[in-house]
A protein has these predicted regions:
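A solvent-exposed, acidic/Ser-Thr-rich amphipathic alpha-helical stretch
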Residues: 14, 33, 37-94, 99
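Generic, low-specificity signal for short hydrophobic/alpha-helical stretches with a mild N-terminal bias
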Residues: 3-6, 18, 26, 51, ...
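Hydrophobic alpha-helical core bundles mediating ligand binding, dimerization, or RNAP-core interactions
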Residues: 21, 28, 40, 69, ...
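Short, low-complexity N-terminal intrinsically disordered segments enriched in polar/charged residues
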Residues: 1-42, 149-152
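Preference for short coil/turn "hinge" residues that link or interrupt alpha-helices
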Residues: 30-32, 56, 116, 121
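A beta-strand edge to alpha-helix "cap/lid" segment located at domain peripheries
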Residues: 1-12, 74-152
């Protein structure tokens, strides 16, 4: 690629990141399972400590493919208490300009503490291919009881 092509590719990727950043947040807040799934590739992988807290048969915390994601989003939407996430973000996100999109739901929100986590996504072909969610100390404390029930 020449310099102009690199600039265009970076601009296109930035547009994809902007779209995913806004649409993922809005669709998750609205519990829009089909809308969320449309942001993921058919064979996407999602890893989160919330997975075994929601799905008893997924104790490794890893979901593979849209059908497993669908089950998690549907059940998670049904079981999500209002206080779990306040959905406050600073509006800032990070990217390497090629494949990564990262943002934070910080613990300290304007109206008090919220679940603290970081969304880390690998984007391929305009879709989320690999999504990892890292939970902070406040969030881990909230889901710890559900996680311990699946421990040996």
């Amino acid at each position: 690629m020449n310099g102009r092509q690199n600039e265009q590719a970076a601009s296109d990727f930035h547009a994809v990141c902007t779209r995913v950043f806004h649409e993922w947040h809005e669709r998750a807040r609205a519990r829009d399972t089909e809308g969320l799934l449309a942001l993921y590739s058919e064979d996407a992988i999602l890893e989160s400590p919330l997975v075994p807290a929601i799905l008893d048969d997924k104790q490794d915390g890893v979901l593979r493919g849209r059908e497993e994601l669908r089950r998690f989003f549907e059940e998670g939407g049904r079981r999500r208490p209002n206080e779990l996430v306040r959905w406050y973000r600073t509006g800032e996100w990070l990217t390497d300009g090629r494949r990564l999109l990262v943002w934070e739901y910080p613990r300290q929100a304007p109206d008090g503490d919220q679940v603290d986590l970081v969304e880390f996504m690998e984007i391929a072909g305009g879709l989320i291919a690999y999504h990892r969610v890292y939970w902070g100390w406040k969030g881990r404390r909230l889901i710890a009881p559900a996680l311990s029930r699946g421990s040996p």
